[in-house]
Each structure stands twice: as structure tokens, then as C-alpha cells.
Amino acid sequence: MCKRIFRPAGGQQRRWIGALAASAALAFGAFTGTAVAQENYRFAIANDLSGPSSFHGKTFAAGFNIYLREVNDAGGVNGKKVELLQENAARDVQKELGFLRKFAQQDNALAAMIVTTDGLFAAKPLMESIKVPLMAIGVPELASNPPHPWVFNIFASYQDTVFAAIDYVFNSIGDKDPKIGVVYPDGQFGLEGLRATELRMQKYRKPVAAKVVMGFRETDATTQMLALKQASVKYVIVHHGGSWIAAILRDAAKVGLEATFFGTTQAMDREPDLILSQPGGQNLAKNFIGVGPWSKWNESSIPGVAVMRAAVKKHEKIEDAKLGDVMYGNFVQGHVNAMVLVEALRKAGPNPTGEKLRDAMSRLRNFDTKGITPPISFGPDRRKGFSAVKLYRINAERKVYEPIGGWVVVK
């Protein structure tokens, strides 16, 4: 791997992530110097490589860059290579905002990405001056509703996953008077899950039976599970990450809470190993249903997933049995994000700018990911690519998530 770390004006180290470097290293490393980089098209991300959500950031970057390597191997776009510049914001909102300005003003990035929901909300008022399209690993509904000219949700939102889970309880399970609770962390990410739960329960004219907070630094959920048990909750919306899901299922069993737990998008950021490794893990897995807006790496019958798997095997030199070691977490999300940005770049013409790329994204209609997601469409008043999700159960024997059915359109 060609790696060069250099100091720009001001003495701050920065790392260039080239699409020709190995994708595992791309989550951490660097690519090239200024002269070469100026000849390439550039996207940029204020990522988390060392903070509490570094798991998301590293896997997202790996998936993004596998797709760029495929694009560059085929000749790039307009004869130029496409690369990803990555800075480590370590889940710090102020650093994310600072890097966004840098991407536009110093690095000539054509589009930018950040990690946090809080950062996305803080950045929205700044984008008219920064003037590059903005996306995030977090996918809150409020990022795209109401629509903002520069902010895009490529995927169905956290709200969509919550709505689908509650609809499943009422319409598929058939419980017309369910006691539903919600577990969420503090901050904007958590509030998105709480708001969505309250809003969907209002549709069915039922109250939320219990609302409990589990912070990002908490590793024990006993107190929260006791509160849910006291409220006689039978279904729980868990708007959190995968490691917290494992703790919640473990401690629910410990206190005797018998319930079905619905995990939203980031709840499946780990493979089921964390759940299955808990005491009685196979039984815990039976109580979990995941809800997410992109297909899983193991759904190999889906054409787009098959192509993605082949690309990973080619560039990582691994066999089928090891694909899960690379394509877990937010890998698929990063891969699809790159697909959308490259398609917009192709439509933006030979001299793209942030504004031209934004307008090209706005013109995308029914962009086909070959089944990794539903078709993706944007418009002047539409900044969310689709509103459909899948529900997943854990196959304990294979240690993978498997879909219960097809795409469920959320209305």
C-alpha cells in the first residue's frame, strides 16, 4: 500500500484515503499527496476512527472504498480516479463541523459525509455557505423532512424502521392492544427513536407503555429492564447499537422480562455473535427482530449483493466463508452511498462542482442497486431515497440475520 501522511498549512496531520489502497486499511490509512489528489475527483468524510462509533465509521469506509476500487479499475469517471478523503472527528460534533468547512474550502471535495445525528442537525444551517451535498451514517427523518437543498438521506430513516416495527406488532402479529416500550440513548439520535415511537403509537391511538434511557456509556441494562417489566411491556423498540442490544436481551432474561425486542437500523451493526455469545444466547436470539434499510451481506441470491460479494473477494483475496469478517456493520451502507455519489458524479458533467453534484443527485430517479435497496429517487422536494425496510430474524445455526420477508414500504 502506498501511504503518505503530510502536514498542510497549520501543522495538522491529515490522511488521504485512495480508492486503490486495500479497503481494510482505508478505514484507517492514507493514499497520496497533493499533486496526484488534484487530478482526482474527491468525496470526503468526517469519520469516527477512534471514538465510540468507530465501528460504524470503519466498516462504512471499507464498503465505500471497495466500490471506488471497482469504479477506478474500470477507468474511473471521465477518465479520472475517484477517492475518499477521511478525517477523524472521533464523534465530536464541533470537529465534524470544522472538517466540513475544510472539505469545501481547502480540499475541493464534491460531497461530504459525517457520522453523527447531532452533527447532521448542527450542520444543516451551514450548508448554504459550505455548498456541498451532505449525508451521514446516521439517518434521522428530520434530516430530510422538511427537505433541505443540500442534505440527503439515501436510505429509509430511523423513523421508518420504528414505524415498520410497530406496524408489524399491530398488523402481522395481530396484537390490537399491545404494551410497547422504547429504549433509547440521550442526544438527537435517541430522541429520533423516541419521537418516532410516540408518533406511530398516536396513529393507533395507544400510549407508549414505558420510555427508558440507556446511555452510550452504560453496559448494564438491569434497571431499564426492570422498568419495562414493571410496566408490563410485551414489545420493546430498541433504538440503539448492537452491543447494547446484547446487554438488553441478556438483562431482560435476567429479570424475567418476556418480550419481543425490535432493533432499529444500527442495532444490527454487529453480526449476531454478540447476542449468541450471551448465556442462553440461542434463546435470546428468538426474542429479537431487526429492522433495517439495506440488505445483508449474506443475502447472496440478490444480484447486487452477489456483485458486492464478488468485489470483496477480488480485492480482499478471501473466500465466501470469510466475507462476514469484512462486510459486517455499516459496510453495505457505505457501498451503496458510494454507488449513489458516483452515479451523480457521472451525471454532473466533465467539470463537476458541489452544486452540480447536488443537482445531479436531485435528478436521480429509480436508481437501481440491483436489490441491495429498493430503487433510489430524489427530487427538489424529496431528499430521502426510499421509505422501505426489511425485518430480520437471527439464524442461530448460521450466525447471520435472515429476512422475514421482502421490502416493506412504510407509509
Can you say where each PLM-predicted feature lies in the sequence?
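Sec/Tat signal peptide C-region and signal peptidase I cleavage site
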Residues: 31-37
